[in-house]
């Protein structure tokens, strides 16, 4: 299962200033970010 809060934190850590948001697609964590 995808944990929304840990997904959000993981995406934020990976993409830092380019991070926009995160969401769960079924059991997968998806990151939304801007490509610099």
Curated annotation (Swiss-Prot):
SUPFAM superfamilies: Scorpion toxin-like
Localization of this protein: Secreted
Induction annotation: By bacterial infection.
Tissue expression profile of the protein: Expressed in salivary glands and hemocytes.
Record-level GO cellular component terms: extracellular region
Intrachain disulfide bonds: 2-24, 7-29, 11-31
Keyword Chloroplast: no
Protein name, per record: Termicin
Record lineage: Eukaryota, Metazoa, Ecdysozoa, Arthropoda, Hexapoda
């Amino acid at each position: 299962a995808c944990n929304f809060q840990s997904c959000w934190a993981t995406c934020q850590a990976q993409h830092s200033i380019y991070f926009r948001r995160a969401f769960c697609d079924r059991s997968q964590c998806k990151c939304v970010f801007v490509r610099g």
